């Protein structure tokens, strides 16, 4: 498959995928997928089992396609996966400090936690948190990281309506300055995020 550096395109496009194919044995998962993604939200949309997560992993360089071209995807990514992968013994700021390293800024971290409705929980170890709170912390970590693009695999799973709205607003803010690739099977959030939809 082909790969290249960032590309410049109309509307600030920074990555382009052409005729991407991937199969596991005799089972085709992705067939001739093509799209461009620039600043804003690009949603990989479709029901379970159509290859959304596989495509995201290919963009991140975690899997290789069988054929096709990837241009502009060799950038610094931050991500939320389906598993949150948090340090259970640390509190919110401890998790962010560890993950972000020299990029950690406490004022920005505190502001992001406030935006996501997590301020009163910041002193508790993550092991005492609910699944929805952990999900929001994982999102905070990805959005605070210094990156060129953000990959989000079902980031709003397990959130109630109020906290889902908080999370969507934070994602929308990030998408004003960089590409956000969002995996989802729920169309309700796509209008709010003004997403360009890739149907799989």
Give, region by region, the residue ranges found by the protein language model.
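Conserved ABC ATPase "signature" region
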Residues: 104-121
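Q-loop/switch helix immediately C-terminal to the Walker
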Residues: 89-104, 108
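Conserved structural motif at the start of ABC-family nucleotide-binding domains
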Residues: 15, 30-32
